[in-house]
Swiss-Prot record:
It comes from Human immunodeficiency virus type 1 group M subtype C (isolate 92BR025). The gene is vpu. The modification Phosphoserine is found at residues 58, 62. This is Protein Vpu. Residues 34-86 are cytoplasmic. Residues 1-12 are extracellular. Keywords: AIDS, Apoptosis, Host membrane, Host-virus interaction, Inhibition of host innate immune response by virus, Inhibition of host tetherin by virus, Ion channel, Ion transport, Membrane, Phosphoprotein, Transmembrane, Transmembrane helix, Transport, Viral immunoevasion.
Length: 86
């Protein structure tokens, strides 16, 4: 057992640490990207819900919220409220 440990070079340990560090960076980057997508989707869902509530209350939709939602989803004209259920 001691012979095996003696034959292992320190470069192997350093290489393993570097590979582990790279894997950790990749995994945390992917997790952060997915987290940002989730937060953005929640914000979009909240805005859609708010626009629908205002449309039901006042009979028309809120222009400010629609503009904010358009900028978030990078679209020109949203037709989220043009449904038969409203």
């Amino acid at each position: 057992m001691l012979e095996l440990i003696g034959r292992i070079d320190y470069r192997l340990g350093v290489g393993a640490l570097i590979v582990a560090l790279i894997i950790v960076i990749i995994v945390w980057t992917i997790a952060y990207i997915e987290y940002r997508k989730l937060v953005r989707q929640r914000r979009i869902d909240w805005l859609v819900k708010r626009i629908k509530e205002r449309a039901e209350d006042s009979g028309n939709e809120s222009g400010g919220d629609t503009e904010e939602l358009e900028t978030m989803v990078d679209m020109g004209h949203l037709r989220l409220l043009d449904g038969n259920d409203l």
